[in-house]
């Protein structure tokens, strides 16, 4: 009996200690505090709901959609001369070949613009009186979309190398390949996420005039262009220096509303200038250049202009990104495959010096003894 009483007493004492400990714990820490700690822990460990995730992704997409990138590359001669089939033989029908080292870059942007200096035609007996005339089969126009090129200007001195038939055949080949194009003193509009982008192409024998430029820009603005690009063919072959026409017309175009001036013809890189709120690319040099098997100046670049929304519906050029390249991926003989230079190399820095206007090398005497 005493043993039973001792056991009962021990049980009662133990229960009393437990109850007393609980009361003291509540008084010391409080139930509210314990609840808040629990709630916070739960909030930190909870996975975001699908609705929250969707909202965050939508917000990120809206932020990203406020920026667009347009890439500019230089002369693309995707053909061989009448005297040498080197380019055609190297490509051998592989449309991905010329831009294999840069296609990923050009396809990752929003739009890419190039200067096209060749004829696409399958016409039998089509010959040119010109020494520097380049022609490829019509299906070689497919190289452009395969490499990420979205638009080409044909406003240059090679437009009529094979006369009317060559010009017509080239236009048809580009249309079949799905590549928009414009010739001398012509305009083009395209839509980019609701914004109209206008392009004006002009050669006029290396001398775009104020009247031509103003008329074209006004026309594009009237058609709703919120961003205007002027593609001019001008300058002196082989020269790193600007002509008076380049300097004057570039500035005039900007003053009339051009946001980017894109130059070609010198076959070498010339400086980039920020004028007012616009970007002037005086010359982008050669890019994939089938016109020469061993060009002496192999420097080129991909220049990317970043567009952002400005006041109202207008877009503005907010940044410029430069990717220095070599027009060939091999030393010596041109393989026609432009490739980015490694950052920090002498070649990389040399491209930057040409584009920032500090390059001090002599002008080239253009030599076409190695016509492709």
Predicted region positions:
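Acidic, metal/ion-coordinating pockets
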Residues: 7-372
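N-terminal hydrophobic targeting signals that begin at the initiator methionine
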Residues: 1-5
